[in-house]
């Protein structure tokens, strides 16, 4: 697209497709060299003034290049900040947190063992109380079961005693009667 192209080739039109479509190539060869140069110059002027594709492409490439460089620099800064933050955390915060955790963990472990021991004692007491309650409940249940049996036995004993007393009384009366009869018979 420069004016320094060789003149040995027939007219090399670098202009817009519109200009190229106006004249066929064969007609350009039949024209004179002055006309060819004018057409060539017009094509170059047209391409420089009206054809902005190369400029736009160049600007686009430049913008993309600058954008990628800035983006790369921004990403590098972000990565560098992350690396610094991680290094600081590893060097300062992590050891501090670890030591605090170890200190607190020891005290928490002691408290946990104490609580565990206390809970174990409470469970033992509850178990003993449950056994006593079960034993008392069993005794009360047994008493409740045996009370009617004992009352029944007492009633039967009283009935038997009453029958025995009545039988003894009858026997005494019988012996008294027999003794009277015997004494009557002896006196005869």
From Swiss-Prot:
Subunit structure: Component of the biogenesis of lysosome-related organelles complex 1 (BLOC-1).
Species the sequence originates in: Xenopus laevis
Family: Belongs to the BLOC1S5 family.
Name of the protein: Biogenesis of lysosome-related organelles complex 1 subunit 5
UniProt keyword terms in alphabetical order: Coiled coil
Domain of life: Eukaryota
Cellular compartments per GO CC: BLOC-1 complex; transport vesicle
One Pfam family matching this protein: Muted
Skewed-composition ranges (Polar residues): 10-19
Annotated stretches, region: Disordered: 1-24
Role noted for this protein: Component of the BLOC-1 complex, a complex that is required for normal biogenesis of lysosome-related organelles (LRO), such as platelet dense granules and melanosomes. Plays a role in intracellular vesicle trafficking.
InterPro entries (alphabetical): Bloc1s5 (IPR017243)
Coiled coil: 101-183
Chain's gene name: bloc1s5
